[in-house]
């Protein structure tokens, strides 16, 4: 049974969307891993991010399907952009991923991450990875930890 992903907590800050966009731009400019894998940030909002990647030939494993490490990197990247969207440096404290269908060369994957819970300095985020047909490829749950006193995108 598929459980729908929860929506992020409501934001009282009227500039929250602008902040999320500034963080996206600042992170992407420094994010060599995301750029090197050809990922793009398709959408950003407070506590949410959609990141896309097309499976290339050099991402295939010995079974001619996308290596799980690349799918994990995609899901982890969406998680990173979602949990940093509040402009507080936030890192992963752990994650789990389940692969439920293969991705193949040429597939356009989208990782959609949403905040499930954010309390104090810890958070929980769910990400699903879908192919271009909307078929679920993987489900990912990340746990985050927010560091003190350092913005991602200084004003």
Predicted feature descriptions by range:
Residues 2-155:
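Terminal targeting signals and extreme-terminal segments of soluble enzymes
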């Amino acid at each position: 049974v598929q459980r729908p992903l929860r929506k992020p907590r409501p934001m009282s800050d009227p500039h929250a969307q602008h902040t999320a966009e500034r963080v996206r731009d600042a992170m992407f400019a420094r994010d060599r891993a995301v750029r090197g894998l050809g990922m793009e940030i398709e959408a950003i909002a407070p506590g949410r991010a959609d990141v896309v990647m097309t499976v290339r030939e050099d991402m295939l494993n010995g079974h001619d399907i996308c290596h799980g490490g690349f799918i994990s990197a995609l899901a982890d990247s969406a998680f990173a952009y979602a949990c940093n969207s509040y402009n507080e440096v936030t890192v992963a404290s752990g994650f789990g991923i389940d692969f439920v269908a293969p991705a193949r060369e040429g597939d356009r994957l989208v990782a959609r991450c949403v905040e499930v819970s954010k309390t104090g300095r810890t958070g929980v985020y769910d990400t699903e990875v879908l192919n271009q047909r909307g078929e679920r490829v993987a489900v990912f749950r990340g746990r985050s930890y927010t560091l003190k006193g350092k913005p991602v995108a200084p004003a």
